[in-house]
UniProtKB/Swiss-Prot annotation:
Similarity remark: Belongs to the class I-like SAM-binding methyltransferase superfamily. rRNA adenine N(6)-methyltransferase family. KsgA subfamily.
EC number annotated for this UniProt entry: 2.1.1.-
Principal localisation: mitochondrion
Keyword line: Methyltransferase, Mitochondrion, RNA-binding, rRNA processing, S-adenosyl-L-methionine, Transcription, Transcription regulation, Transferase, Transit peptide
Name used for this protein in its record: Dimethyladenosine transferase 2, mitochondrial
Keyword Nuclease: no
Role: Probable S-adenosyl-L-methionine-dependent methyltransferase which specifically dimethylates mitochondrial 12S rRNA at the conserved stem loop. Also required for basal transcription of mitochondrial DNA. Also regulates mitochondrial DNA copy number. Stimulates transcription independently of the methyltransferase activity.
Cell compartments where the protein resides: Mitochondrion
Top EC category: transferase
A cellular component term, taken from the record's GO annotations: mitochondrial matrix
Source organism of the structure: Drosophila melanogaster
One BP annotation, GO: rRNA methylation
Length: 452
């Protein structure tokens, strides 16, 4: 059985004042993690040993089924969960600890001194890895390579090269993971790592929902994530088990995303996700940027109609889509033991992907928002195989988009420089109202939203 815990309301009452919080945690955590609550912190730390023990028990079957001998812990902080990793001596021969705060470094370095061959320590901000990538691109530096120097490298089709554990509340972090797979840079250049993360419910729902939730939540990012990754929900973990504390959610009438932001605000979702081993069979690596642009461009509005949009690139292609003699191949759940009724509200099961999962009865009124991720992948595969593809204006638009990527100010705003903002789009801080620990030094000019 899992250790007993206090209810959310009782635990919150126990530490409702700043003084009580500081009294309990000041020995292990710096004041800036205790002094004020945040909307949604990008970096989070396990607050106590009881929480670490609960999480360890949730992850027991996942660790046991993994043959990986390398694990990376993000922001290990006071080391509560690190102790459980150290106890798995027969499994984890290498433990990489990445820490972004100076306060915790002396204690973490002690672990390296005790286990010099097994524990490797790096100071750096993994959650903001996209910033390091951008800085390296600007000055030819090696920040990313240095931070990941202890990570074993494997071929993409091999088994996973490491497990990554942490608590992350940063939406740009997950967008960077998508871009890393698409453009074969950064983390996934070293192999397919499996991530086990505690994350805010709105982000997980946004990434794993289907079109039944509505066009405001089911975004191009949702489609890309589900095409690229296999995902599995593990458990809900109490938000009060993590520092810094979070402000109480108070819905506003003007919020477009109230129904998502109000789901389980007192919890984080413990989930795992891994890049698909057969990704390059579904879409060749050199075609991944084209797939990315195809989805981004056509989801400028999910109400865009498929045939009129594609005929802008390949005139007269509509009849090929309407009259399709090929039989469709269905997709199946990757984890059959995962019961849909036990999944978080609005999230869906991870399924296999197919390039022959045709949307039934496509017509001139069918919208891109009607298609599921596997059906979008199938549509792109059809489009890619047409003889007109090589001479289509799509490739010129793609080339222009990639050129803009090279000059974009920073990765979270790449889409603004590459495609039109999505109709009635929700910005990153609307999907999850996060607070960045490092304020931007230069205001970024944003385009006005396009109306369709």
């Amino acid at each position: 059985m899992l250790p007993l815990r206090c209810s959310w309301s009782f635990a919150r009452a126990n530490y409702s004042t700043k003084k009580e919080l500081v009294t309990r945690y000041s020995g292990d955590f710096p004041e800036k993690l205790l002094n004020r609550k945040q909307k949604v912190p990008t970096h989070m730390y396990i607050a106590n040993s009881e929480a670490a023990a609960r999480i360890n028990q949730y992850l027991e079957p996942h660790f046991q089924s993994s043959g990986c001998d390398t694990v990376m812990e993000l922001n290990s902080g006071a080391g509560y969960f690190t102790r459980h990793l150290l106890d798995r001596e027969s499994q984890f021969r290498r433990i990489i600890l990445l820490e972004s705060m100076d306060h915790f470094m002396p204690k973490i370095q002690e672990l390296h001194t005790l286990y010099p061959e097994r524990v490797k320590v790096r100071q750096g901000d993994f959650v903001n890895l996209w910033k390091l990538v951008y800085m390296d691109k600007m000055d030819g530096g090696s920040r990313v390579a240095d931070l990941l120097s202890d990570v074993p490298q494997k071929a993409f089709t091999d088994d996973i090269n490491m497990l990554v554990f942490g608590a992350v509340g940063s939406y740009p972090f997950f967008k960077h993971l998508i871009n890393s797979l698409i453009f074969q840079t950064s983390l996934f250049n070293l192999g397919r790592c499996e991530m086990i993360l505690a994350m805010p419910p709105p982000i997980y729902i946004h990434l794993t929902c289907n079109n039944e939730i509505g066009y405001l939540i089911y975004r191009s990012t949702s489609v890309l994530f589900q095409i690229l990754f296999e995902h599995k929900f593990i458990a809900k973990v109490p938000r009060e088990d993590f520092l810094p504390q979070q402000m109480a959610y108070s819905p506003t009438k003007s919020s477009k995303l109230g129904k998502v932001q109000s789901i389980n605000p007192e919890y984080l979702y413990l989930v795992k996700f891994t890049p698909r081993r057969n990704l390059h069979e579904l879409c060749q690596s050199q075609d991944l940027p084209a797939l990315w642009f195809f989805i981004k461009q056509n989801y400028v509005s999910r109400r865009n109609r498929i045939i009129p949009n594609l005929e802008k690139w390949v005139p007269g292609c509509g009849p090929r889509l309407i009259i399709n003699p090929k039989s469709s191949e269905s997709v199946t759940p990757i984890y059959p033991d995962e019961l849909p009724k036990k999944l978080p509200q609005y999230s869906c099961q991870s399924t296999t992907m197919s390039t022959r999962n045709y949307y039934p009865g496509i017509n001139i009124y069918t919208q891109f928002g009607d298609l599921l991720p596997s059906q979008i992948l199938t549509l792109f595969s059809q489009f890619r195989q047409w003889p007109e593809y090589g001479e289509s204006s799509f490739l010129a638009s793609l080339e222009n988009a990639l050129l803009k990527l090279e000059t974009a100010n920073d990765e979270p705003n790449l889409e603004d420089g590459v495609t039109l903002p999505e109709e009635d789009d929700a910005e990153a801080d609307e999907i999850i109202e996060e607070e960045s620990p490092v304020p931007a030094t230069t205001p970024v000019k944003r385009r006005r939203k396009a109306s369709s």
